[in-house]
C-alpha cells in the first residue's frame, strides 16, 4: 500500500529536547499516511537528546537521526533537506503536535491541485503554570497567503 504513496520526509530540527521529543515522535508515528520518514537533526544539544533519540531509533525504522554541531534552526533544516529521500518535504518543530490525518490531507490536496507547495492553517497552544493558552489560531485563506507572500508578512520566526 505504501508504494502507492510518494515518500514524505518530515524534517525536525531539535535542540535540548530530551524531556519531550519522545512524545512528539510517538504522536507523529500515528499518521494515517503510510509512506513517510522522519529526519531529525540534533543541532548540538547539551542535554540527553542524543541518547533519547538513539534509544527511540532502535525500535522505529522511520527515524533518521543526524547529529551536528549547533548552527541554529535554519542550518539544521538545511542539513535535513540534504539527507531527505522523500518526493515531498514537511517541516515540523520538535515540540509540534499534528493531527493523525495531517500528511494524508496534505498529500490529497497536492494530488488534487498539482501544487508545488501546500499550506494549511495553524492552531497552537502552550501550558504555563497549569493554564492552557491558545495564542495562535490561523485559518487558511488562499487569498491572504498570496498577499502575505508578496508583502513578506512573517508571523513566526523561521530561522
Model feature map: region roles:
Residues 1-159:
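Nucleotide-sugar donor-binding/catalytic module of glycosyltransferases
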Amino acid at each position: 500500500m505504501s508504494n502507492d504513496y510518494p515518500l514524505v520526509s518530515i524534517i525536525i530540527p531539535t535542540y535540548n529536547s530530551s524531556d519531550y521529543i519522545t512524545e512528539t515522535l510517538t504522536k507523529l508515528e500515528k499518521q494515517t499516511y503510510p509512506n513517510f520518514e522522519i529526519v531529525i537533526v540534533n543541532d548540538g544539544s547539551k542535554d540527553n537528546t542524543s541518547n533519547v533519540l538513539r534509544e527511540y531509533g532502535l525500535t522505529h525504522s522511520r527515524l533518521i537521526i543526524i547529529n551536528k554541531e549547533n548552527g541554529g534552526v535554519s542550518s539544521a533544516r538545511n542539513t535535513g533537506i540534504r539527507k531527505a529521500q522523500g518526493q515531498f518535504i514537511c517541516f515540523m518543530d520538535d515540540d509540534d503536535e499534528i493531527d493523525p490525518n495531517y500528511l494524508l490531507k496534505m498529500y490529497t490536496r497536492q494530488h488534487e491541485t498539482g501544487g508545488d507547495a501546500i499550506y494549511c492553517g495553524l492552531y497552537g497552544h502552550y501550558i504555563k503554570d497549569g493554564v492552557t493558552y491558545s495564542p495562535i489560531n490561523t485559518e487558511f485563506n488562499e487569498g491572504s497567503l498570496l498577499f502575505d507572500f508578496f508583502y513578506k508578512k512573517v508571523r513566526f520566526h523561521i530561522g
